[in-house]
């Protein structure tokens, strides 16, 4: 009986650790899968006016396994190469000037419900400017002769621990970069 008093707390800690790690790992995989699917869609869409809208639809589909309210931010950004990183200002800023200077568009899960007509790079749209205006999809270089652009997708998710034994939450971030698919020869 005394042995059970010593072993039981350790056993429960072990079981809860497996439980927490499993759910955290599921969210981590959800983030990496979402950035991968989203950047592929953005790459294929190239410089069509609704490229960011198509990327958001891909992100919405790929992130279906993530619990509601965990996605904080999705950013589509211009990269200089396959090993580039997202500009640090794009990770946190909502300032139009900062986003335009860094050529990145940011989105939240609320943007999943946007209508496709709300995209198209119009900074003077009513009642709200188009969300893709900071790095307009129609300005992306898709000609082999001109040197193709690289497009990146970044995502940040906060996973809330269920038991609280390992803290309250952990943040997962991931980004993926691909060369924009050529649209013309």
Report each predicted region and the residues it spans:
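Alpha-helical transmembrane segments
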Residues: 23-33
